[in-house]
Design a protein with these regions (language model features):
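Short substrate-entry loop that stabilizes the transition state in hydrolases
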Residues: 77-85, 90-127, 278-282
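Alpha/beta-hydrolase active-site loop
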Residues: 133-159, 194-210, 214-217, 233
Length: 359
């Protein structure tokens, strides 16, 4: 039987823990206003800088801010609610934007998360010159790691982030990025194999001729070019990040993984993809690698959906500018898909990052 002093000691420890955790319990359940702030992060891959945003819970009333073609459901530079919160970093797809998933960011922030987005250099809506090169294929996860490090070192943000509760989310090439961060290892020679089998797949193989010409200009065959990228996997350090505890991957580019590479994932993954994805066909991507994921804790296949369903529901302005990424097949309601996706993402990160919630 425990002594009275030891029972009292445990009681005091429990009380102290309760007092420390109580604000987190409230924040995990409450829906708050959201603030966001523009950031600039040093890019260790290209040597320049990366723009992005940080979204965070705020006591300020909800509002909408117009940023380019995006209607962001957050107040610019609103004061944050104090206290350390879990962090999720979102990685966009090829040619994407640091605001392409702002609805997911604001949803998570309204439920107690800090969320960071970044614009990947040489692989964004105004510059895709790095696609097919090490700067992108290897550099992307390094840039996410740099974003995490910068926020944890910044006096403005470090006290708002729980360094032990960090997750990543990503779409398409951003989903690929997320998988690398939790341990996946790509085999880039699979690109060549894929394009031999699907030479008319413009979404994946459209740069093959350009890259072949570039390889020849350097005296390399395409096989040697790909081997060079494979050799660059550790050029900027490990692509995995032990600080990242979980990955939420939406329609991930995964045709360049083999079973051994996927088996190296050692943290929880939630996999989302569209049933009728015509950009990253499921049989060569998500559905193919799904059986190899030993740490898969959730999966959702969106019926009839194509690739672009994972982009936020578009504003009227963005729909006019880019109807391809803003359109869905008949029978697919992007707003409803995202409502479910946000609920799933929140539940996934709460569980895998061990965030306490009230009963």
């Amino acid at each position: 039987m425990a002594s009275v002093p030891s029972r009292l000691a445990r009681a005091w420890c429990w009380l102290a823990l309760t007092l420390l955790v109580a604000p987190s319990l409230l924040l995990a359940q409450a829906v708050t206003g959201v603030g966001f702030h523009a950031i600039t992060i040093h890019d260790p891959v290209n040597g320049g800088s990366m723009p992005g945003y940080v979204f965070y819970p705020s006591a300020q009333a909800k509002g909408t801010t117009k940023v380019g073609p995006y209607d962001v459901n957050a107040a610019l530079d609103a004061p944050p609610i104090p206290g350390a919160k879990p962090l999720v970093v979102i990685s966009h797809g090829n040619g994407g934007s640091d605001l392409g998933h702002n609805d997911l960011a604001t949803y998570l922030a309204s439920h107690g998360f800090v969320v960071a987005t970044l614009e990947h250099p040489k692989d964004n809506f105004h510059d895709t010159s790095g696609v097919g090169h090490s700067l992108v294929l290897v550099g992307r996860p390094i840039q996410v790691k740099a974003t995490i490090s910068a926020l944890l070192d910044d006096p403005q943000w470090k006290n708002l982030i729980d360094a032990h509760r960090i997750g990543v989310a990503g779409f398409s090439a951003g989903g690929y990025t997320s998988l690398l961060l939790v341990g996946a290892v790509p085999r880039f020679a699979r690109f060549i194999d894929y394009c031999h089998r699907y030479p008319n797949d413009d979404a994946i193989c459209h740069d093959a001729n350009k890259i072949t010409a570039e390889a020849r200009s350097q005296g390399l065959t395409l096989d040697q070019w790909v081997a060079k990228i494979q050799g660059d996997l550790t050029r900027w350090g490990d692509t995995a990040d032990p600080r990242v505890k979980a990955a939420f991957a939406m329609a991930p580019l995964s045709l360049i993984f083999d079973q051994d590479g996927i088996a190296k994932i050692d943290r929880p993954v939630f996999l989302y993809y569209g049933q009728d994805d015509h950009v990253l066909r499921p049989t060569e991507n998500a559905a193919r690698v799904r059986p190899w994921m030993k740490t898969l804790v959730g999966i959702k296949v969106v019926p009839k959906a194509d690739h672009w369903v994972f982009i936020d529901p578009c504003s009227a302005e963005l729909s006019k500018e880019n109807p391809v990424i803003c359109s869905d097949p008949p029978g697919v309601d992007r707003v409803k898909v995202h409502a479910q996706l946000y609920t799933d993402a929140l539940a996934f990160f709460r569980k895998t990052l061990n965030i306490p919630t009230t009963p």
